[in-house]
Curated annotation (Swiss-Prot):
Biased composition (Polar residues): 758-772
Protein name in UniProt: Rho GTPase-activating protein 20
Organism this protein belongs to: Mus musculus (Mouse)
Basic and acidic residues composition bias: residue spans: 811-824
Function of the protein: GTPase activator for the Rho-type GTPases by converting them to an inactive GDP-bound state.
One Pfam family per UniProt: RhoGAP
Site positions per UniProt: Arginine finger: R399
Domain Ras-associating: 194-283
The keyword Phosphoprotein is annotated on this UniProt entry: yes
Domain Rho-GAP per the UniProt entry, residue ranges: 365-551
Keyword set includes Phosphoprotein: yes
Gene that encodes the chain: Arhgap20
Region Disordered: start-end pairs: 1-40, 745-772, 803-839, 935-955, 982-1011, 1074-1101, 1142-1182
UniProt KW keywords: GTPase activation, Phosphoprotein
Length: 1182
């Protein structure tokens, strides 16, 4: 088959073409078609999406793919010639520092090629090096960083780089290494010339020549060249004390040689590149083309190559520092792809290690060389002074990490000799730079040669032996090291003394700083390093705790002098502020800005956890002229109805009314008491701006605005500015002397107004009770015009006033318990509503804890606080008054029981006198339509009912239940739990009856319907008449039956559960029919027997109904009934009881019952001679 052109091949890939046009089937051209379509699709796509997809895709590993799967024929054809053969090829990982590169290597007999595998299985050439310029070595750890397998790796390099080559297996590694060493040696034999002159420049070496020219062979390594250079320069020493550097025009920075490289190959590679550029691109340059290889100085700067000899300690620092300037390609992280902007030089020029020391005058130099006459350099003294001054008040000093960029910039400034103002730097940055300085001291400040001796110190017996050994080891150190250690451990000891505030104990400090003070001389296993690190930490901890015994007692005075000298050197014109980059709060760091401020002693006394943001004592408008600190208590939580930007002026009231002084107070911790200034009243030392400030109360501080502490005494010229910006400080309101005098004058008025408020509240209660009763009567009268059906609306609820209290009321319900009506928004009079609104602001909110004002020094708040102390501690007041309340409650129960007994006796007497004048009539019970609603009662007995609510009777204490009425009890009630009410209007329900009926002999002062439970009465109940008979009871017999009933009810309640269905059936099957009797005691005996039978059959749930079965179901009677006589007799008793009730106000059960103490109904009668009667009974707990 004929070969197709690329255009025909592309056409064959199109789906619409037939096989006749392409000359081949689609199936045959399938794989190639997919491959080319993928390439075209990638070209059409936008560059960002293609880069993102490639970055997110899994990068194929060259180790997993076999070389046979990649077509290498086309790639190798460009290198193959008659004299070149391929020895081996395969995947490898090249590592340089922290960079990893996956490459595919090709080894020819005279050439080494490194290529990168592309996604379409093609190769891209990365390096092509002659074997004569290459070298190999086994120093893996000196080239690469991190975990490396030495069994699978070796060092492979060429001018002027070194890589760690890692292969798939040790066998592959050995095979590659042997082939490289063999053919490198063979190619070096072909070099011409065998030797070349090499100029060596000496730098940082005193008393020697500037440079020397030596002759090197093509097989000489860098270590051998160093030995020859030392002899030529007349320098005594070992080759380990010096290092050879290469300054190539190809690289931006000098490159250090480890020792196994070939300087001959490095220089010849530069000459060959020059020859290739001048003579043309040829595979190699013949020796004839290099007739003048010694005229390197005549070449351009970028083609030159110089070798520099430096001492090892400076060379080590230069190696790590210049690596930051050395350009090398760095793979971008896909995580930061959104920040790829502009040039990539800031990524490609990053140092290999961010903590690498910078060469110069300070870092990487031994202390004896830095210290002149055993005096520390000024930058080191400044840092120690700053840490000694600010470190004790800084939380997490030496532990909190700092910004690496700030650390690097500060190190560069210090290393270059530039004067640095440490006040402008973060204390965490200074602490980090100091640790970096310790890490860069050659062989550590404790000397790595004495490492084993230092580690064994903690294995000794007692502290005296340890101190003696430590002092002997210190004598072996250079004098400059000991001087620095004295200052350093003095600072650490001072920080440890304030560990309660900075949370840095001796152990925490030792853990943070021990790795920078001492480390082992050589690398060891991780297990041994961890064990040694622990021992070194214990040693440093012991030194911090016993530094005065080790270094002498004068170390404390040394630190004091140091702090004073540092304060004198720092002039007050330095006004630089820099926000701390640490994670700690900025306010806490602002408190640490000036340790010599008058409040420093106050801040130092703070304990752990007492410097939280909500407990910082704010200091505003600090007066430089006053010797004492003026602290203003933060006033917050003003009237929430006012906006934040609105000013609230204080004006004298025009008329006597409660004065609302909005004072926000909260629970004061012990730490805040310690912060409170101990000076006299603060009003005497307020500045002028603060004296004028009380004219207008300040707005609330926003949550985003920090509290500003003006503790810096050096910012005197900013005082006027910050006085204008006083609203941004945390002092939200300031009161002046005028306000203090005014508050003292209004205090007696407030006391009198409170008494008036209580009286008006009582008066408002009576008015609200009348309004409530009248409104209920009106609503009930409206419902009487609907015929025989009486509908009770759910909204028209009687408002009871009960004295029963729920003893477990929470403090949150306390303000609501002091209300006097059930619905204050609807029934309260205007003056009571205003009083409640004014007092509502003064109540402590539920979220605010109670406080006890012990250390408040503001004299103008004492009177206000003493008046509000009982409200702030309402929970404690309830607990103290609980016993007194129980005693008063019991006494009221006894009095209420007596009144009930008296009223019952009086009712019985009235019944006896009127029983002879009444006749029995048939009454048709009305069809009631009762909506289910909660019952109301004046006899609240939480102890007797399961739900805490009591049983009430709205119209009468006793009523008759019809034979066909459905009565569904919902809860068990007490047989005595009943309520007496007066008669209602005669006209309200007169249309519901065929003829008026009068019953006599009932033991109660009023007639009504008993609704002791929630009941559902059917509308469609068949109306049938029932025989009603008049019964006369003797008082003693009635009371005896009541006591027996009460005992039976209390016993049966505990043993027998209420069964609503059974009681319902009993009420249907057993209508209440009592025989008619004339008069006298037999009726009482028969009534007592019938009551006992009812109690035994129906249980306690129906006992109350048995008492009420003798009354007419109609709740409305004529005004001329004999019960008005009983009401007239009870009036004096009720008036007397009302006086007792008004004298003792008690909290209520809940917010709905808390506004009433007894059920009170005002009724109008048709009789002109009868006047409206107010009848109240107090419920008791029996």
């Amino acid at each position: 088959m004929e070969a197709m052109s690329p255009q025909q091949d592309a056409l064959g890939a199109q789906p619409g073409r037939s096989s006749s046009l392409t000359g081949m089937s689609r199936i045959a051209g399938g794989p190639g078609t997919k491959k080319k379509m993928k390439t075209l699709a990638e070209r059409r796509r936008s560059a960002p999406s293609l880069i993102l997809d490639k970055a997110l895709q899994k990068r194929p590993s060259t180790r997993d793919s076999h070389s046979a799967s990649i077509d290498t024929c086309a790639f190798l054809s460009s290198f193959m010639c008659s004299s070149r053969t391929l020895l081996i090829d395969g995947p490898v990982e090249l590592k340089r520092g922290l960079q990893r590169q996956e490459r595919h290597l090709f080894l020819f007999n005279d050439l080494f090629v490194s290529a990168k595998i592309k996604y379409n299985n093609n190769f891209k050439i990365k390096n092509k090096i002659r074997l004569t310029d290459m070298w190999t070595a086994s120093c893996v750890e000196e080239v690469g960083e991190g975990n490396m397998n030495a069994q699978k790796s070796f060092v492979l390099g060429w001018p002027t780089v070194n890589f760690v080559a890692t292969f798939s297996s040790p066998e592959q590694k050995d095979k590659w290494l042997s082939l490289l060493q063999r053919y490198i040696a063979l190619e070096k034999e072909k070099d011409y010339p065998k030797s070349i002159p090499l100029k060596i420049f000496a730098k940082d070496i005193g008393n020697c020549a500037y440079f020397k020219t030596i002759t090197v062979m093509n097989s000489d390594t860098a270590s051998e060249v160093i030995n020859m250079s030392l002899q030529m320069l007349g320098i005594t020493g070992s080759e380990r004390d010096y290092q050879l550097w290469v300054n190539s025009g190809k690289e931006a920075a000098p490159y250090p040689l480890i020792g196994h490289e070939y300087p001959y190959g490095i220089k010849m590679s530069h000459l060959r590149d020059t020859a290739l550029l001048t003579q043309g691109s040829r595979d190699s340059a013949s020796p004839s083309q290099l007739q003048e290889p010694f005229l390197m100085e005549q070449l351009p700067r970028e083609m030159q190559c110089q070798f520099i000899l430096k001492p090892t300690r400076l060379a080590t620092a230069q190696q790590l520092s210049d690596s930051s300037q050395k350009t090398f390609k760095r793979r971008r992280s896909i995580i930061n792809w959104a920040f790829w902007r502009g040039s990539s030089t800031h990524l490609d020029n990053l140092p290999m290690s961010p903590t690498s020391p910078m060469p110069g005058q300070l870092f990487g130099v031994s202390l004896p060389d830095l210290c002149e006459n055993d005096n520390l350099p000024k930058p080191i003294l400044d840092m120690l002074s700053f840490l000694n001054q600010k470190g004790p008040l800084t939380k997490g000093i030496f532990r909190q990490s700092a910004n690496m960029k700030s650390c690097r910039e500060l190190k560069e400034k210090l290393n270059s000799g530039i004067e640095v103002h440490l006040d402008c730097e973060s204390i965490f940055v200074i602490a980090s730079v100091l640790k970096d300085f310790l890490r860069n001291i050659p062989e550590s400040i404790f000397s790595s040669d004495l490492y084993d001796h230092w580690v064994c110190v903690m294995d000794q017996g007692n502290d005296e032996e340890k101190i003696n050994i430590i002092q002997r080891l210190l004598d072996q150190l250079p004098r400059a090291n000991v001087v620095f250690l004295r200052y350093l451990f003095g600072v650490l000891h001072n920080i440890e003394q304030h560990s309660l505030s900075n949370q840095m104990t001796a152990f925490n400090l030792a853990v943070c700083i021990a790795p920078s003070i001492l480390w082992p001389p050589a690398s060891s296993s991780p297990e041994l390093e961890n064990e040694f690190t622990k021992k070194v930490s214990l040693l440093i901890q012991f030194l911090i705790e016993n530094c005065c015994r080790v270094f002498g007692e004068e170390i404390a005075s040394l630190l004091g002098e140091l702090s004073e000298r540092s304060d004198r050197e720092h002039t007050p014109d330095i006004t630089c502020f820099q926000m701390n980059d640490s994670s700690y709060d900025s306010l806490e760091n602002e408190l640490n800005e000036e340790a010599d401020a008058p409040c420093s002693d106050l801040v130092k006394k703070l304990g752990q956890g007492s410097r939280s943001m909500d407990s910082v004592l704010t200091l505003s408008d600090y007066d430089l002229e006053q010797p004492e600190v003026e602290g203003l208590l933060t006033l917050s939580n003003f009237d929430l109805d006012q906006s934040k930007e609105e000013h609230i002026p204080i004006k004298p009231p025009l008329e006597p009314k409660p004065v609302n002084v909005f004072v926000g107070y909260r629970k004061v911790s012990l730490g805040e008491h310690a912060r409170a200034p101990a000076g006299p009243g603060t009003l005497s030392c307020l500045p002028v701006a603060a004296a004028d400030a009380p004219k207008v109360l300040r707005r609330h501080r926003r949550s985003s605005e920090p509290s500003i502490d003006y503790l810096d005494t050096k910012l005197s010229y900013l005082r006027e500015f910050y006085q204008k910006k006083l609203r941004k400080s945390s002092c939200d309101a300031v009161l002046s002397r005028k306000d203090e005098d005014y508050l003292k004058q209004t205090q007696p008025q407030k006391k009198g107004d409170k008494v008036c408020l209580k009286q008006s509240s009582v008066t408002g209660t009576d008015v609200s009770k009348r309004n409530t009763a009248n409104e209920n009567i009106k609503k009930k009268s409206l419902s009487g015009h609907e015929g025989t059906q009486v509908t009770l609306f759910t909204k028209s609820k009687p408002v009871p006033i009960s004295v029963a209290s729920y003893s477990h009321g929470s403090s949150q319900d306390h303000p609501r318990k002091q209300a006097f009506d059930a619905d204050p928004c609807r029934f309260s009079p205007p003056h009571l509503t205003d009083a409640q609104k004014s007092s509502r602001v003064q109540h402590r909110r539920c979220s605010e804890p109670s406080i006890d004002d012990q250390n408040y020094k503001l004299s103008y708040l004492r009177g206000i606080y003493s008046m509000k102390q009982n409200k702030a501690s309402c929970e404690a007041g309830l607990l103290h008054g609980e016993d007194d309340y129980l005693r008063r409650h019991k006494s009221l129960q006894i009095e209420g029981q007596k009144l009930i007994n008296q009223s019952l006796v009086m009712g019985i007497e009235v019944g006896k006198s009127s029983s002879s004048h009444q006749s029995t009539e048939k009454v048709l019970p009305p069809r009631l339509n009762l909506c289910p609603r909660a019952s109301y009662s004046s006899l609240s007995s939480p102890g007797s009912s399961p739900s805490g609510s009591s049983v009430s009777s709205q119209d009468s204490a006793f009523s008759q239940i019809s034979e066909h009425s459905v009565f569904t009890p919902t809860e068990t009630s007490s047989p005595i739990d009943c309520t007496f009410q007066t008669q209602r209007k005669q006209e309200e329900l007169s249309s519901d009856f065929d003829s008026p009926s009068r019953l006599s002999g009932m033991p109660g002062p009023s007639m009504g319907q008993a609704s002791s439970h929630l009941a559902y009465l059917r509308k469609g109940t068949t109306e049938q008449p029932s025989q009603m008979h008049s019964v006369t009871l003797h008082p003693s017999a009635w009371l005896r039956s009541g006591l027996v009933t009460l005992k039976n009810w209390s016993l049966k309640k505990k043993t027998k559960a209420a069964r609503p269905e059974d009681r319902k059936v009993c009420s249907l099957k057993e209508p209440l029919e009592l025989p008619s009797c004339a008069s006298g005691t037999p009726e009482a005996d028969s009534l007592q027997e019938s009551q006992d039978d009812l109690q035994g059959d129906e249980g306690p749930g129906q006992t109350a109904c048995g008492f009420s079965s003798y009354a007419c179901q109609d709740s409305e009677q004529h005004a001329g009934s004999p019960f008005h006589l009983a009401e007239s007799r009870l009036k004096p008793c009720m008036k007397l009881y009302k006086g007792e009730e008004s004298g003792g106000q008690y909290p209520c059960d809940n917010p709905w019952e808390g506004a009433s103490s007894s059920l009170e109904t005002t009724e109008d009668t048709a009789n002109p001679g009868a006047e409206p009667t107010t009848f109240a009974m107090t419920g008791t707990d029996i």
